[in-house]
Amino acid sequence: MDVYGLIGNPVEHSVSPPMHEAAYEALGLDARYVTFEPASEQLDTALEGASALGVRGLNVTIPFKEDVLDVVEPDPLAERIGAVNTIDFEGEPTGHNTDAAGVIRAFQHHDVERSGTAVVVGAGGAGRAAAFALADEGMEVHIANRTVSRATALATEVPDATGHGLDELAELVPDADVLVNATSVGMEADETPVPKRHLHEGLAVLDAVYAPLETRLLREADAAGATTIDGAWMLLFQGVEAFEIWTGKAAPVEPMNEALRSSL
């Protein structure tokens, strides 16, 4: 039996186990997905133990996404983003960041072209992944953040990117082709990071928030004629990418999606 899993603290509310277990069942794989919850100071020991026990791969969640960079060799994209969310133990353990693929594959699934101008709201982990992913697709990326210095600092790392404060969204969003909310704003029903007057037809909006699935931003974007993509799609496709890295097989997207959404 092949063993995969999730390492983080806490992990009890993660939806990754049912999503990956659904993939194994759909493909008839003899595999299990388990969770590991070490204390912060035990990360090195936990990863060494997982490798010694023959664990094939791990997803990584808070608070370890950055700490893992000191333990396993990251691939070039994970190194640029500055975070690892997937470890492949085949051969020399390698760290990957599949959040970037989660963004791109979510847009691909909804037939959204990644060309023109993108606005990314948020300069944290999800914002970094989205900014690098869209820049690598050839898009001009504008990063807006409550703390402007974080946006401008990230923009110096991302090709063809600029950093802005949230007050500049009024100028940025009306001309954008793609908008990504990479903040937690929207978890409260009446909050949105972008006023509805800036949303427009022809815009594609991805909201990384997945609880609730239908955020105020997505409702107002839909009313404005924009293409809307909820956060579960990004969550799904980062998991799909991890599955494919570990197994070398095409992931069964629909069973994984059904299991994920049933768990939210």
From Swiss-Prot:
Which residues of this UniProt protein bind NADP(+)?
A: 122-126, 145-150, 208, 231
Q: In which pathway does it act?
A: Metabolic intermediate biosynthesis; chorismate biosynthesis; chorismate from D-erythrose 4-phosphate and phosphoenolpyruvate: step 4/7
Domain of life per record: Archaea
Which molecular function GO terms apply here?
Answer: NADP binding; shikimate 3-dehydrogenase (NADP+) activity
- Oxidoreductase: present as a keyword of the record? yes
Q: Which residues constitute the catalytic centre? A: 65
Q: Which GO terms describe its biological process?
A: amino acid biosynthetic process; aromatic amino acid family biosynthetic process; chorismate biosynthetic process; shikimate metabolic process
- Family, per the entry? Belongs to the shikimate dehydrogenase family.
Q: What is this protein called?
A: Shikimate dehydrogenase (NADP(+))
Gene that this polypeptide is encoded by: aroE
